[in-house]
């Protein structure tokens, strides 16, 4: 098991991301958000873009799972979709690279080609497969990813409306049984109770984003509850 994954075993990773259209979009703010997460006990940070990661790395000494979200014409894959994004992340010295490992059409290289290229050029970095189905998890495991995450359950056209926590984390349990790599619970982990249930279901660790780092999303849940 990769050293980064050992540090995250049975612990919380906080996703600190704010896209351009969001109020907290700022590398400085994401660095502060990561510091707050560390002070709260997080064991790692997931972050988007070279700029944000450099700021976070200068602010906290936690392992960083890096992604670059970038859209390409004719493809629904936007999480670290090509080697261009991988190179940017390595310039920020990330500890782990997460990428879309779904069966959706890719903009350039195949997933297998990307994994081979990364292993050749950057052999020390850990790789996380963001998947949406059991089939994708099994394929990612075959390709040699260091860990597999349920990040994209509900976010592909063929899993729309689904969540990793559905049916008492049935999908996550199936993945844990079917693959050798550790499985990370991520996506719509909106409460501490859900996060705890994910670990009980066999998750190696839990990634929580919006429920901690997106104030507009948190506010909306309160507003809707009062209506």
From Swiss-Prot:
Molecular function GO terms recorded: N-acylglucosamine-6-phosphate 2-epimerase activity
UniProt keywords, alphabetically: Carbohydrate metabolism, Isomerase
Gene3D superfamilies reported for this sequence: Aldolase class I
Top EC class for this record: isomerase
Gene Ontology biological-process annotations: carbohydrate metabolic process; N-acetylmannosamine catabolic process; N-acetylneuraminate catabolic process
GO CC terms of this entry: cytosol
Protein name per the record: Putative N-acetylmannosamine-6-phosphate 2-epimerase
HAMAP family reported for this sequence: ManNAc6P_epimer
Coiled-coil boundaries: none
NCBIfam families xref list: PRK01130.1
Enzyme Commission number(s) from the entry: 5.1.3.9
Family: Belongs to the NanE family.
CDD domains: NanE (cd04729)
